[in-house]
């Protein structure tokens, strides 16, 4: 049984931890608001760009003028996975959910005899995936020193992916991230970047007829690389919002658990103190009677 001094020290230690978790919750809540606004602002642009890309791709079709980023290599042998997670922890299962989603996909591809390569964006995903797939990781993007995610960060990743594709390093590229829904809901998501899927053309009204200058294929050649960077940018923003939401929820739970632990330790402390006082009183009374 711990002594009164030990219990007192433990109570003080838990109270200090509770102050830290409460402060971290408040910081995460403040950052969440800004991150959520940024993620929600990026969604319409990325969705609209994907829609425009789809319409132009439908016009081009699969003829010889279509860019390779849209048509692909014609093979499905080598897959590149871009896995986006957070640089830091203390956000519940946020990072492990994304990494688990990517890991299951890797296992599935390997079981089919495919070659897999991984680019890790964020330290936590790298730490998780390298335990099983260290030999498959070809690059790691470090964003620890980036205070605010900007388009230039996503653009560098996008250029790296396109460079690898142009060099014949892979056939299919899939982006993994967590789509932010709410503070308590972040959904691990996989999105194919290359080949850029034409999808279904989005109707622009009854007379949606366009002429493309210089031509649709040339526009696609410029648009697809930008779309890749835009989709990565959106994924990074969604991740930041999801990370802050998960961190706020985790720190709220930690603060509440610390409060419950303090109550239990305080109750135990008071019981032991009461028992010690009672014992001392009995000893005093017994000594007085002996006299």
Swiss-Prot record:
A family per Pfam: ATP-synt
Source domain of life: Bacteria
Membrane topology listed for this record: Peripheral membrane protein
Gene3D superfamilies to which the protein is assigned, alphabetical: 3.40.1380.10, ATP synthase, gamma subunit, helix hairpin domain (1.10.287.80)
InterPro entries: ATP_synth_F1_ATPase_gsu, ATP_synth_F1_gsu, ATP_synth_F1_gsu_CS
GO MF entries: ATP binding; proton-transporting ATP synthase activity, rotational mechanism
GO biological process, one term: proton motive force-driven plasma membrane ATP synthesis
Keywords: ATP synthesis, Cell inner membrane, Cell membrane, CF(1), Hydrogen ion transport, Ion transport, Membrane, Transport
Annotated S-S bridges: none
Role: Produces ATP from ADP in the presence of a proton gradient across the membrane. The gamma chain is believed to be important in regulating ATPase activity and the flow of protons through the CF(0) complex.
Family membership noted in the UniProt record: Belongs to the ATPase gamma chain family.
Name of the protein described by the UniProt record: ATP synthase gamma chain
Organism taxonomic ancestry: Bacteria, Pseudomonadati, Pseudomonadota, Alphaproteobacteria, Hyphomicrobiales
